[in-house]
Amino acid sequence: MPSGSGFHNIEEAGEKARKRDDWIAISNFHPGWFSVNMGTGITAILLQNLPYQFPGLHYIAVILFILNVIIFFLFLTISITRYCLWPDKFKAMLAHPAHSMLLGTFPMGFATIINCIVFICVPVWGEWASRFAWGLWWIDAAVSVAICYFVPFMLMTKHTSSLETMTAAWLLPIVAPVVAAASGGVVADSLQNDTHALITILVCYVMWGSAVPLAMVILVIYFQRLAIHKLVPRAAIVSALLPIGPLGQGGFGLMQLGVVAKRVFPRLDFLAPIAGDIFYVMGAFIAMIMWGFGLIWLWFALASFTRGKFYFNIGWWAFTFPLGVFTTATTQMGKEFNSPFFDILGTFFSIVVTCMWVLVFALTVYKSCTKELFR
């Protein structure tokens, strides 16, 4: 039997192994982990704005919001630690054809926190919380635009890629400004200063115009890839849901910006007297078209999932956010059209997203504890 010192040596070796595993986890951390923020944040937003509320639902949304903030700052701290200890890993990440695409998850996860501040904190804390959210939004918008402009150019000049290896993850850096534009509409609606709201929504329309058409181009290329080379590998099959992200969030953003434009434009005598109504109606019209386009991509994704087994990885968080933002467009149409159909459908989608969040979050915690996700 081992002596006392032998037991001590075994315990010391085990402690060193655990510390080594922790450093390996930090070393292997990548931006895709911020998709946890995206999924958690959109679930909180859906529950907070569910068309059919019940007692206690608001507090569940608040708990998810707080959890999301904690996770965000935890991941941000890990990321800063990683790149401070291993500066070369940042350059390697930018040069990586897959990991660089995941940069877009950072501002999109941050945007869900900003939206929750508006939905949850502003009604309680008042105008200063709205101004605080507005300040955070400008940071998010700047980061989103930088990623949208920089990463696709890296794809053109530095990355080695082919049509066969393409996945829908190419959309992630491009969708970031779409999410920021939609978030800007939410923030602008809470601002009491009409001039600030006007500036915000005009910037949002420009961001929307920069990103949504480019996302449509990527969708065309992605469809060609699927038609020629068939479905993506099973490890990446969950990414089949990503195309509904820019369509759902783009539609929601246009409707939300139209709501603010309808209110703010006449007050500031901006453009013609009916300009706000035109922006509102056109936003709803285009949003319906984008929502319909999203339906067929949702069908493609669901049909793809039935083609075989696939195993858990961090990419499973794609089950939550794309469908979540598609749901926000659905519930917004129910609100603007006064439609029970869209209210019920939005509620159904919200329940599905919440159930998927519970499943994926539980698996993520379990696989993180076993270190399987960091190998």
Swiss-Prot record:
Expression induction: Expression is strongly increased during growth on protein rich medium containing keratin or cystine-arginine.
Transmembrane segments: 26-46, 60-80, 102-122, 136-156, 168-188, 201-221, 235-255, 278-298, 310-330, 344-364
Main location: membrane
CDD domains (alphabetical): TDT_SSU1
Mode of membrane association: Multi-pass membrane protein
Disruption phenotype: Leads to hypersensitivity to L-cysteine and sulfite. Abolishes the ability to grow on human hair and strongly impairs growth on human nails.
InterPro entries: SLAC1/Mae1/Ssu1/TehA (IPR004695), Sulfite_efflux_TDT (IPR051629), Voltage-dep_anion_channel_sf (IPR038665)
Pfam family for this entry, one: SLAC1
Membrane-side (Extracellular) residue stretches: 47-59, 123-135, 189-200, 256-277, 331-343
Annotated glycan sites: 193
Keyword annotations from UniProtKB, A to Z: Cell membrane, Glycoprotein, Membrane, Transmembrane, Transmembrane helix, Transport
A GO cellular component annotation in the UniProt record: plasma membrane
Subcellular location: Cell membrane
GO terms assigned for molecular function: sulfite transmembrane transporter activity
Ranges facing Cytoplasmic side: 1-25, 81-101, 157-167, 222-234, 299-309, 365-375
UniProt similarity note: Belongs to the tellurite-resistance/dicarboxylate transporter (TDT) family.
Purpose of the protein: Sulphite efflux pump required for the secretion of sulphite as a reducing agent. In the presence of sulphite, cystine in keratin is directly cleaved to cysteine and S-sulphocysteine, and thereby, reduced proteins become accessible to hydrolysis by a variety of secreted endo- and exoproteases. Excretion of sulphite mediated by an efflux pump also represents a detoxification pathway for dermatophytes during infection of the epidermal stratum corneum, hair and nails, which are rich in cysteine.
Protein name: Sulfite efflux pump SSU1
